[in-house]
Amino acid sequence: IGTIFFSLIHIPLYVKKTQGIKFKFNPSWPDNIKKIFTFKKQIFDNLFWSLFWGVPIWTAYEILSFWFYASGIISFIKFSDAPVYFCIITLLIPAFRDAHFYLIHRFLHFKFMYKIAHSVHHRNINPGPWSSLSMHPIEHLLYFSGVIIHWIILSHPFHATFHLFHAGLGSANGHIGFKQMLLNDKLAIDLSNYNHYLHHKYFEVNYGNLMIPFDQWFGTYHDGSDEMHHKMQLRLKNKI
């Protein structure tokens, strides 16, 4: 499913280039040939880290969760037993994921973690859809580890599955590189999160997403404006 999902975005925008650079955050195209990338090409690099590490680790978490449920190691609740509670857990998953992502992302920006793991993802200064899960396996283990909450609290296999798919497919939101995709001359769909694009551009801003305003609270928010850019420069200068 992930392969189909990312391909449906990547092919029209980056292979066929059906709308050129219209609505693209960065008017340049990703670096196709660069020594820093695995196999010296961004798309090959992204496919390798996503498909050979990301998808297997995602799958391993899913299989382990199902095995725990099936073997009775962890209990689960049925919708018919507590429909309100079931729905509340479902609705809280995006918020929990937001908090979990912010915490692990800050951890990944610690110098030693960045060097051994997160630098793989940050090769993509000009990201595309396949950059979403292009991570070192250590980062994949942390990124998908949010599902462990369902091994602790009473939930259902549906919640674990939804959580993992929300993480896996939802990662595209900040990496597509286009604000909108044109379906025809009059119709377009919103695609990407400018907030995370700026993180790839400047590194030291927008560690979280927008549901919970962690970056506003901790002074690392950047909205692309000159004012916020100046604040970022002052913060980094004082940090030095």
Regions picked out by a protein language model, each given a short descriptive name:
Residues I153-I212, W217:
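Functionally important transmembrane alpha-helices
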Residues H109, H122-N126, K179, H200-F203:
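Alpha-helical and His/Cys-centered functional microenvironments
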Residues I1-L108, I116-S119, R123-S145, W151, ...:
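Non-catalytic, topology-defining segments of multipass membrane proteins
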Residues F110, V120-H122, L164-G170:
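Active/binding-pocket-proximal capping segment
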